[in-house]
UniProtKB/Swiss-Prot annotation:
The keyword Transmembrane applies. The gene is ATP10B. It is a multi-pass membrane protein. NCBIfam families: ATPase-Plipid (TIGR01652), ATPase_P-type (TIGR01494). Residues 1-82, 133-316, 391-1111, 1165-1194, 1247-1252, 1317-1461 are cytoplasmic. This is Phospholipid-transporting ATPase VB. It comes from Homo sapiens. It catalyses: ATP + H2O + phospholipidSide 1 = ADP + phosphate + phospholipidSide 2; a beta-D-glucosyl-(1<->1')-N-acylsphing-4-enine(out) + ATP + H2O = a beta-D-glucosyl-(1<->1')-N-acylsphing-4-enine(in) + ADP + phosphate + H(+). It comes from the Eukaryota. It is an enzyme of class 7 (translocase). One of its GO terms (molecular function) is ATP hydrolysis activity. InterPro entries: ATPase_P-typ_cyto_dom_N, ATPase_P-typ_P_site, ATPase_P-typ_TM_dom_sf, ATPase_P-typ_transduc_dom_A_sf, HAD-like_sf, HAD_sf, P-type_ATPase_IV, P-type_ATPase_N.
Amino acid sequence: MALSVDSSWHRWQWRVRDGFPHCPSETTPLLSPEKGRQSYNLTQQRVVFPNNSIFHQDWEEVSRRYPGNRTCTTKYTLFTFLPRNLFEQFHRWANLYFLFLVILNWMPSMEVFHREITMLPLAIVLFVIMIKDGMEDFKRHRFDKAINCSNIRIYERKEQTYVQKCWKDVRVGDFIQMKCNEIVPADILLLFSSDPNGICHLETASLDGETNLKQRCVVKGFSQQEVQFEPELFHNTIVCEKPNNHLNKFKGYMEHPDQTRTGFGCESLLLRGCTIRNTEMAVGIVIYAGHETKAMLNNSGPRYKRSKIERRMNIDIFFCIGILILMCLIGAVGHSIWNGTFEEHPPFDVPDANGSFLPSALGGFYMFLTMIILLQVLIPISLYVSIELVKLGQVFFLSNDLDLYDEETDLSIQCRALNIAEDLGQIQYIFSDKTGTLTENKMVFRRCTIMGSEYSHQENAKRLETPKELDSDGEEWTQYQCLSFSARWAQDPATMRSQKGAQPLRRSQSARVPIQGHYRQRSMGHRESSQPPVAFSSSIEKDVTPDKNLLTKVRDAALWLETLSDSRPAKASLSTTSSIADFFLALTICNSVMVSTTTEPRQRVTIKPSSKALGTSLEKIQQLFQKLKLLSLSQSFSSTAPSDTDLGESLGANVATTDSDERDDASVCSGGDSTDDGGYRSSMWDQGDILESGSGTSLEEALEAPATDLARPEFCYEAESPDEAALVHAAHAYSFTLVSRTPEQVTVRLPQGTCLTFSLLCTLGFDSVRKRMSVVVRHPLTGEIVVYTKGADSVIMDLLEDPACVPDINMEKKLRKIRARTQKHLDLYARDGLRTLCIAKKVVSEEDFRRWASFRREAEASLDNRDELLMETAQHLENQLTLLGATGIEDRLQEGVPDTIATLREAGIQLWVLTGDKQETAVNIAHSCRLLNQTDTVYTINTENQETCESILNCALEELKQFRELQKPDRKLFGFRLPSKTPSITSEAVVPEAGLVIDGKTLNAIFQGKLEKKFLELTQYCRSVLCCRSTPLQKSMIVKLVRDKLRVMTLSIGDGANDVSMIQAADIGIGISGQEGMQAVMSSDFAITRFKHLKKLLLVHGHWCYSRLARMVVYYLYKNVCYVNLLFWYQFFCGFSSSTMIDYWQMIFFNLFFTSLPPLVFGVLDKDISAETLLALPELYKSGQNSECYNLSTFWISMVDAFYQSLICFFIPYLAYKGSDIDVFTFGTPINTISLTTILLHQAMEMKTWTIFHGVVLLGSFLMYFLVSLLYNATCVICNSPTNPYWVMEGQLSNPTFYLVCFLTPVVALLPRYFFLSLQGTCGKSLISKAQKIDKLPPDKRNLEIQSWRSRQRPAPVPEVARPTHHPVSSITGQDFSASTPKSSNPPKRKHVEESVLHEQRCGTECMRDDSCSGDSSAQLSSGEHLLGPNRIMAYSRGQTDMCRCSKRSSHRRSQSSLTI
């Protein structure tokens, strides 16, 4: 749809002539100003006109096309409730089935029961569901009414002021004014914020579950407003994308009156449902309203997954339908045969009105339909309701398991999917993320390398080796220091001098206090408030012990920074001092960390305007700083630094200490900005400038203790990524402190107290494609435009400046040396399991940046291909970088991860790790968590070529197949062993397990080359698979590939947004509540806090849920078939007339009351094996993987047993009462009683756990039957005419035959079942049977039996001869295979390497791991050699054995036999 409106150009000219000022903005001229009318395509974009006097007509024309802000989540109205609810209920085939039977029963020729009685069950079900749906919809109506009537201030055009209105009155284009703690009523574009920096703080917990605050900034050009926003002065048109459900994606542009454009994104959008925090006032214009808001578009309702048991049950239901049809056919044919035996029409065969009789064929068809009505219970429709109730009970007990509760986070397991709990007991493959899932995701700065020099931080390493030194409850040795503004200057000078040396930074976390066995957070601060004492605190490790050697160089670098002048050359030198300064500046600046002080409240507290102490003190401080900045820098360094006491005296009592301060310590730090002749902001001031020489502590003494200056305010850093927070804390340990951050500038405090304010020109955020982040700043001392970049080493190394392009030969050699040594250190860090990041910089000229910024603004203003253009502009800037160094961050393994992985592996579960980390880091973590063992044969494949990948997969697969052939037992014929082509190994010998390590590029080659089948076949021989450098899309593709091709049950577990696709692709998705937000949790089926909880969740609760539900389903199917067959056998004695010997009300009560509760209790509370035994014997989990409790054989065995029991229950009473003159109901009552007794006793035999509740339910059901029968038979005189069951039960209770039959028949009926269960328990070889025997033993004997079991199950040690030999691979012509690291930049050498040489190289590398790193060694083999070498069993030589021992001593992280291709 094209919409043509008057452009605001002419109206703007008219307004300018009347004296209205022009609103300045950062724009790019893209449109011609001569055009008087502008055309917009409303089908592809959204156009928003402001609701003010100038655009009133355009707003009226456009806004009526958009929905209002009134929301309605109800499904019904008062008039549509009854018909629509019935229509929805009859969409279920079960209700249609019952309705079909009711209609059939209303036909006179097919009537079996009373018509009203047949309608009653269906009517009750429909009525109950209708009441439930009505109550739920009424609750939604009340909620909608409360939301729609919430108050908000909307700008009224006629009154030209903000008016209090309801949310439902908001329209697209309205101006909305919001205050602190108010909820955003619609999706609003932020135009004004009371924050002087144009920032609005949001809490998005209602959308994504994250409690940390988010920053939103006003649109460019509106951030410098010093007065209130005036809607009448807004003369811009907004064009943006159509409504969608992407919470983190938004793009559009603002067209100004001069037809220039300013682009904006999601950083300026306030989403509906968020809460304004720490911002007194925010004003914006409504972009999306009502059901078009992103929050409403994301309310798609709960996802429905069908469990494996339910899929199996649906198949068996079709078998039951087949049985029903067969029985009805027998009844129809039998009825025709029976009628054919009469030579004349019998008296009960009544003719129609014309006196004619039905033909035999038509009579048989009617009888077929009549038999369906009679045997309808054979289809267990109530089974679905029972299953839902059982699942609710299982989830209830699962959610209340204290073992799955995490004290640190105060969170327990969340069951977000109620219908797949039983699938937890059948998992065969687990796909896990690494960071935050296997590891803590609490990053700790471990070591770094700068300009090729490595700083190991040994003191930091020793401290970190102490397990959870700072996290233990009894060793909490720090207290939260709540420092006010005045405390910054209040410390005694002697305190500073006594704190010399490098000391670790103390944490400012709250102490944990035990309360009745559970831990809760107790504030240790002095400030009494309901809010947390630490605003925006992140649960990350902040303790860093500086390296003494690096600390000295940092001090020199800080002093060097002070000597810089405006004449600094454009091309920075590669000196160590300057590089160290730039390195720590990059750590401090290149991030998106939010800064606050520990005393900053969560919600802003306002003070009365009469309080002028704050303004007076700030004005004096600013005047003092302006005067002091006139001093020379050299004078400031020749003088000594001031003491805190003296500085406090000089400032006097004007320093504000109130918590309601509008400016925190960070704003005070940056209070002395000025503008020099160069046109850039030089924001640098020194604490030493404000006092005379000789007063207080010297600068040298201050630099000696950069990490212990407790007099300075304690800053809290809130980071989106734990990596960023760890780097900022590491820089803070060296006194490069991030003081404040705004959209316009970043302030950094140097070790000597000097504050530098960098103008923030542009921020290129991190994304999974670029794998890096950059900031463009203007240096306050030199005026240079500097690009600081950090990112993955695999990306940064390719973006560095080519040393060959450097004209200076010495500089070229130096660059190559730095690059090689940094890569060497990166490999060392990776082998130590550290996360690596490279730091680089680039100096950009003014002209280049101006040209690039113009392209960037055009990309931001683009609507169609905005993301592609932004990516392209980022790539144009992030190149020709200068390497500064790299960091190694430790991400500790979570507690219990190695034990959990080992246990899951014993349970027969294949574990794959899909991570985006580099290969060396992932492999190291895999060894640490026992995913890969020392004796594993590890295949590492790194290639981008499809042909090479196929050859490698074929050869590796061939070798593994041959080694598996060695494990097969010898073939025998009549007791004689047949000759074998390959030599066999002894039965005690075990061939080592294989592991596969593969990277993202190889995965691309596999998916693009149609090699998925070979890849999966290879993984079948591997115990563990490790996919490194994998993207979120690759993760989901792998999960779908394994799930669909192998037809196995899969589980994915992760904690980050990049794991969402993988979690949703698996049969069961588990999210971990970690440090990376709640997106993984919100998209998961279950949410846990620790990976170790997965062990009990699967092995115990998974086994129980599967075993209970599977056996309950089998029992339910058996119960219905057994009972219905009683009616079927009776048809052989009533001429297949569809008569019954049991009263119809008794039949209804049988399923409704008498046998409904025991299966529910059985499905919720039964425990076939105790939790302790299940955890001690993980092999028991394989019973669920193999579907031993419920499969095709168990179904048919139960069906045969049901037919047998029904035969016994019918024919023993028949023979007992044969020849007597009892009536039909007197004959049916014993059969009904016997059937109930047999079914309940069958249930009792299946129960493995007996409690008082079980006994009460079974006995109560049995007694209820007699109680209801006695009352019904005593009161029902004419209720079921003509055959009323009056006094039938009372008469049977006085008949001895009744007692004899009721006692003897169940025993005979259950004898085969009892014999089968006894034989299974005595001679059965299943693991479950053996475990049940062990479970019944006393605790001491049970523990001994479990130990004996585990000793028998433990595999034998791997003999020397059983280890496979690996030879280097012959390549296809022109292909290379790296024998060590995949990042080899040297040309490959064509040579042949024997097994011993490869093994020696590996062992030697491990023995010298701390001294050097493996170099770039590549090997390309001759075309005549085999890819993996010949497969043969060979004894290791003495030298090789010694080398193996060397490998064992040197590192536990390496495998005994590995091959990198």
